[in-house]
Regions:
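Outer-envelope beta-barrel architecture signal
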Residues: 10-16, 53-59, 114-118, 155-161
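Outer-membrane beta-barrel proteins
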Residues: 25-27, 66-72, 129-133
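Residues that define the transmembrane beta-barrel architecture of outer-membrane proteins
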Residues: 35-43, 97-103, 135-146
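Residues on the lipid-exposed face of transmembrane beta-strands in outer-membrane beta-barrel proteins
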Residues: 43-49, 103-109, 146-152
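Short, flexible helix-coil linker/hinge segments at the edges of structured domains or between repeats
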Residues: 73-87, 163-166
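Surface-exposed extracellular loop regions of Gram-negative outer-membrane beta-barrel proteins
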Residues: 108-131, 143-144
C-alpha cells in the first residue's frame, strides 16, 4: 500500500546494483533452459522530501538482458512460467534472447486532516524476446498498472485500501 509507506518515516536513500549471472545444469524447470546468462541493472531510491511539503516519493528502474539456451516446451512466450494453468508447448529445444525493463514509482501525501493519507503506485513493464529458431522471432510484453491507495488512521491503528487497475 503506497499510502502506508509514509508511516515508516523512511529516511532518504538510493541504491544501484549491477550483476551478471550464469546458470547451468539439469536441476531446473525445462522451460528455463539448460544454460542462462543474464546481465542485470537496478536502481531505486526515495524518502520524505520537505521540498514537496512532506510527501513521500519513491522510484525504481531495472533492466535485464538474458540469453536462454536449450529451453524446452516453450512455443513462443517471453515468460513461460507466468502462473497460467496451462502450458503452450513446443517439443523442439530453442534459444532465446530476451530483455526487459521495469519502472515503478510511489507518491504519498503527508497526513491530511489528522486522519487520511492518500497514495498512488505506478508500474510499467516492457519486455522483448526473440526465439532464435522460429519464423516468428519477436515477442513483446507490455504492462501498465496504476494502484491508488488510501489509509485512514485511528489513534494507534490504521486501515488501508488498495484499488488495482491494469
Amino acid at each position: 500500500n503506497a499510502a502506508g509507506a509514509i508511516l515508516d518515516n523512511t529516511v532518504r536513500y538510493s541504491t544501484v546494483s549491477l550483476g551478471y549471472d550464469i546458470g547451468n545444469g539439469t536441476f531446473r524447470r525445462p522451460q528455463e533452459g539448460k544454460r542462462v546468462n543474464s546481465l542485470d541493472f537496478k536502481t531505486e531510491g526515495g524518502g520524505i522530501y520537505e521540498g514537496l511539503h512532506g510527501m513521500y516519493v519513491w522510484g525504481s528502474f531495472s533492466y535485464s538482458r538474458y540469453k536462454v539456451h536449450k529451453a524446452e516446451y516453450n512455443a513462443s512466450l517471453i515468460d513461460p512460467l507466468r502462473g497460467m494453468p496451462f502450458i503452450i508447448a513446443d517439443t523442439n529445444r530453442s534459444n532465446w534472447v530476451n530483455q526487459d525493463y521495469n519502472l515503478e514509482m510511489q507518491m504519498t501525501t503527508p497526513l491530511l486532516w489528522n486522519r487520511v493519507i492518500i497514495g498512488i503506485t505506478g508500474r510499467y513493464q516492457n519486455a522483448v524476446g526473440a526465439k532464435q529458431l522460429d519464423p516468428r522471432p519477436l515477442v513483446r510484453l507490455s504492462q501498465f498498472t496504476v494502484i491508488p491507495s488510501v489509509i485512514v488512521k485511528f489513534d494507534k491503528h490504521a486501515l488501508g485500501l488498495n484499488f488495482d487497475y491494469y
